[in-house]
Amino acid sequence: MENGCTSHWLLSRIAGSESRLANNRAFRCGSIEKAASYLIGELLIINQAEAKSNKRLPKFVHKADTYHKACARCKARGKTCAYGQGAVEKQTVHKPRGQASSVHMPVPMLVPPISSAPSLETPPESVAASPPTVDSIPVSHHVNEDPEAEPDLEKNRAYYTAHGRFAGQVAAAINERAGLIPATCNQVPLVDAPLFGDLNLPSQSCALSSSTELPPRAYADQLIDIYWQHVDPMEPVLDRQRFLENYEKAYSTPITPLCADYDLWLGILNVVFALAVQRQELNPLHQRNEEANRFFQRAWVLLPAESMLWKPGSLELVQCLMLMNRYLHCTNNQQKTWTTAGLAMRIAQSMCCHLTETPLLKGSSDDKALKQKVWASCVALDRCISWSLGKTSALVLIPSPPPSSPQQLGENAMHDTLGLRLHEIGNQIQLAQIQNRTSLAARFRPPLLSQQDEYHNAALQLDACLQDWENSIPSDWQPRNLRMVTDRSSRAERYLLHLRYLHHRIFLYRPMLARFYAMKPDTQPLHKSPSLSHRLLRESASMCIEAAQQVASLVNETLEPDEPIGLLPWWYRIYYLHIAGANFLAAMFRSELFTDSVSQSWESVMLALRAHEHLSPYVQQCLWTFETLAARITGKPYPSMDGGGCGLMVDGSSGVSFDDIFKDINFDFDNFIFGPEDFGEGLV
């Protein structure tokens, strides 16, 4: 039926209901959705009348009749509703088999846009945000019913987010989880886990009466000493000489402002106090969080939004934002964490901190060195924020370090040079992943080169870059020699540098790990030998697990139970332990990956996390989540929050969904790889 005929047919059928339409308030008020719903109701009434006289209405009326029922079925099966607005539009393009033509109807007039059908690209937030329950998990929520599906769907599946999250069979194994209490801890360290407790930030328009107060000089000296010894070496931001000069003036003349931006400097000082308080691991939990949060709230009030957005930028403003961002990183303020990092990066760029030579700018060599130091910290901060929050980091031009030998560089210059080179490799890794996840890249990809093959080609070159970086490290910087470094600050710097290097390796190999676990175990026929692509995929997954093992080993080396302050900040230790633990959970699905060595590394991660339970309530929740997920895979009794055991879980061979396991720790492998907008990985 043509569009014009359809319109006349509708008018003739509804003409008899003109009086009811005129009296309908929704129709008179111009509500399109309600009016469309009313029209469908009229069509259903006509449908019932026509059925009595054995007359048949056009096919689309029958679809309207079954709209809500079909939506319920599609929702239960986890598929996009075939009767949704977007799906109907697609059906008008593809002709069904066995029909010469299909009826093309004006969809907006027939299907009320009451609710959009679930998108295949992004799962509904309500589903992604809540852990699965026994009754809410379907038996099979990924059944390909499209007879014209792409033949290479399985091949590119792990590299294309449009196909949604990984699907798997849940079958009878889900019924055996009837007594399971779903994990309520979906938070991730340095993402949204409140490691520093609940931080309530006051409105910046409401100044705190104590915002300009300073602690007693003796206690302040103690906190300043802790910061320079145990916080600044990890990520240097401030110039020590300038900071100490202003610090002395603040206590010698506390009433007279030191400079025009006195409030800004007080904000820096209060964040320094807050980080130093959190660094003391032996202090009682509630006392530490309460005191540190009070210092941070003072700094927050002292830095109003107008000073960040509309006033000219300064190095002090960038430094204050970076310090604030470090603290916010360990709270549940994701939006403020992401925003402060972006502001610091943009303001630093506006000041040309990213340029090695700025002949038009006046300033001493010390100012230029400080700008380069701040810019290097900005890049490191942006990388940490973006990879942990699952956002795309800024692909900025990083100045090339001077081509000097290790003997010609000092210790600090060597650390900065290695850091800049590593950040540049990280830029290339992320760029390769972004290029592979865009539709534009797929359009210009050679016909015989799949998304998987293209990323594998890039990964080979990037792996060589990482290997060259590791080979360029002097012998006394190698991991095997780190324990022999006598200077505590230097040893901490080198440990953190190697942890970041291993993080880059995990970030590079994780797409292949995701692809490896998306493949069904029986996809390879028994009578055929594994292909080269399959072997490379398996080897890449093994290298990802090996990097996670090295992360766990390095973190355990830094543990010093007898020291009041650990070698590395305790929030970084929890962060990297969480990364390693998630990869070990993935290894449990494959016997060729979860070897005895990996099992020992898994146990070391659990022991290390138990040693951090006194530092944050989140650690106990993380432990319980890891133990529960491991029990689901291995079939051992899973624990409860009170320490008791629960029923038995089944092993991975019985059809437990891989994504169903990892959604409880907010870990979406598919979104992490190549999401349409963000990476979407909670762990990185």
Swiss-Prot record:
Disruption phenotype: Has low impact on expression of the sorbicillin biosynthesis gene cluster but, except for very low levels of dihydrosorbicillinol, impairs the production of sorbicillinoids. GO terms for molecular function: DNA-binding transcription factor activity, RNA polymerase II-specific; RNA polymerase II cis-regulatory region sequence-specific DNA binding; zinc ion binding. Pfam families: Fungal_trans. The lineage of its organism: Eukaryota, Fungi, Dikarya, Ascomycota, Pezizomycotina. It comes from Penicillium rubens (strain ATCC 28089 / DSM 1075 / NRRL 1951 / Wisconsin 54-1255). GO terms for biological process: DNA-templated transcription; positive regulation of transcription from RNA polymerase II promoter by galactose. Transcription factor that acts in concert with sorR1 which is a transcriptional activator of the gene cluster that mediates the biosynthesis of sorbicillinoids, a diverse group of yellow secondary metabolites that restrict growth of competing pathogenic fungi but not of bacteria. One of its GO terms (cellular component) is nucleus. SMART domains: Fungal_trans. It comes from the Eukaryota. It is found in: Nucleus. Residues 114-151 are annotated as: Disordered. PANTHER family: REGULATORY PROTEIN GAL4 (PTHR47424:SF3). This is Sorbicillinoid biosynthetic cluster transcription factor 2. Keywords: DNA-binding, Nucleus, Transcription, Transcription regulation.
